[in-house]
From Swiss-Prot:
It comes from Thermotoga maritima (strain ATCC 43589 / DSM 3109 / JCM 10099 / NBRC 100826 / MSB8). The active site is at D89, D261. The keyword Zinc applies. Its EC number is 2.4.2.29. Keywords: Glycosyltransferase, Metal-binding, Queuosine biosynthesis, Transferase, tRNA processing, Zinc. GO terms for molecular function: metal ion binding; tRNA-guanosine(34) queuine transglycosylase activity. This is Queuine tRNA-ribosyltransferase. Homodimer. Within each dimer, one monomer is responsible for RNA recognition and catalysis, while the other monomer binds to the replacement base PreQ1. It catalyses: 7-aminomethyl-7-carbaguanine + guanosine(34) in tRNA = 7-aminomethyl-7-carbaguanosine(34) in tRNA + guanine.
Length: 369
């Protein structure tokens, strides 16, 4: 993997990652395809939206369909019909959001959410699975503390994350895949600093900021990001895990972050909310019943070129799944377009103006919510 920072504006960075399945311009938003599928979208929909990289999840794919099925297809790309880069999460976040039977330095034993059977996962198994999946970017297996963990619990998770990162790198024997470390530390600046220094001492192809945007105050999210970025190398990509709202992404880009993922755009689409250049729009609301406007007049996606707000309102009113599909198409197109505008604004020196506008319309709740 190669990464080049081509231009900066303050701390915001315009860059490019060269991965096994193609180049990815940064800052970038990665649509989430947890089960080898971005909900309600085909790979062609994603290609038409301009998605350069998507995320899938090791934990879920390990359970169903299982690694052997994906091996039959010679990797995840063939399995899901996606030719561009893929990033796979290690499964750490999902494991630690489930009831655990046992956790120690060796690994984690938990019950499968599918059938209740006991499952064991550790750094070596996570690396083995991700190598078999053939993703372009793999993540180390980390210990993500629960949101209400106290200082000592977060400290223990941070120390374990370091030990597991060492084991992850040792087990990562492959040439065409990149491996990112994950910085933990909760909402404690000293632990964030310690984790960042530990991970960079090992040396990875990129670094993720984990364990944030899980319920803490927005000011803490931004503060901990600043603390973490300060100790990350300039020549490696920085990935904020789970950040997906437009205003948060702009705030994080302004603090030197390059990569983002979230189910936020697709999840709210399924509940009738569109992302627009004027903020969020609730298509279920009755005032859309007679509206002949597109979802967003600035958008050129399939949905906005062909359908009115009135029609999409009707689809949600009658419980037709097409409404969810059309809004999902739109929201992913909006996020990809937003990141293109972010990159253009860094190039042209107008990033502050773009950030100000996006933060204003989304922090105020947007229009017609």
């Amino acid at each position: 993997m190669e990464f080049e920072v081509k231009k900066t504006f303050g701390k915001a960075r315009l860059g490019v990652m060269k991965l096994h399945h193609g180049a990815v311009e940064t800052p970038v938003f990665m649509p989430v395809g947890t089960n080898a599928s971005v909900k309600l979208l085909t790979p062609r929909d994603l290609e038409e939206a301009g998605a350069e990289i998507i995320l899938s999840n090791t934990f879920h794919l390990m359970l169903k369909p299982g690694v052997e099925i994906i091996k039959l297809h010679r990797g995840l790309h063939n399995f899901m019909g996606w030719k561009r880069p893929i990033l796979t999460d290690s499964g750490g976040f999902q494991v630690f959001s489930l009831p655990k039977i046992r956790i120690d330095d060796e690994g984690v034993v938990f019950r499968s959410p599918i059938d209740g059977s006991k499952v064991f996962l550790n750094p070596e198994i996570s690396m083995e699975v991700q190598i078999a999946l053939g993703s372009d970017i793999c993540m180390v297996f980390d210990h993500c503390p629960v949101p209400d963990a106290d200082y000592e619990e977060v400290k223990e998770a941070t120390e374990r994350t370091y030990r597991w990162a060492l084991r992850s790198k040792k087990a990562f024997k492959t040439e065409n895949q990149a491996l990112f470390g994950i910085v933990q530390g909760g909402i404690y600046p000293d632990l964030r600093r310690e984790s960042a220094l530990q991970l960079t001492s090992i040396g990875f192809d990129g670094y993720a900021i984990g364990g944030l945007s899980i319920g803490e105050e927005r000011s803490l999210t931004l503060e901990m990001t600043e603390v973490t970025v300060e100790f990350l190398p300039e020549d490696k990509p920085r990935y904020f895990m789970g950040g997906g709202s437009p205003e948060l992404i702009l705030e994080l880009v302004d603090r030197g972050v390059d990569m983002f993922d979230s189910v936020f755009p697709t999840r709210i689409a399924r509940h009738g909310t569109a992302l627009t250049w004027n903020g969020k729009l609730n298509l279920k609301a009755s005032y859309n019943k007679r509206s002949l406007e597109p979802v967003d007049e600035r958008c050129g996606c399939y949905t906005c070129k062909n359908f009115t707000r009135s029609y999409i309102h009707h689809l949600f009113d009658r419980g037709e799944v097409l409404g969810q599909i059309l809004l999902t198409i739109h929201n992913i197109n909006f996020m990809i377009s937003l990141m293109k505008e972010v990159r253009r604004s860094i190039e042209s020196g107008t990033f502050k103006e773009l950030k100000s506008k996006v933060v204003e319309v989304y922090s105020s709740g947007g229009v017609n919510v």
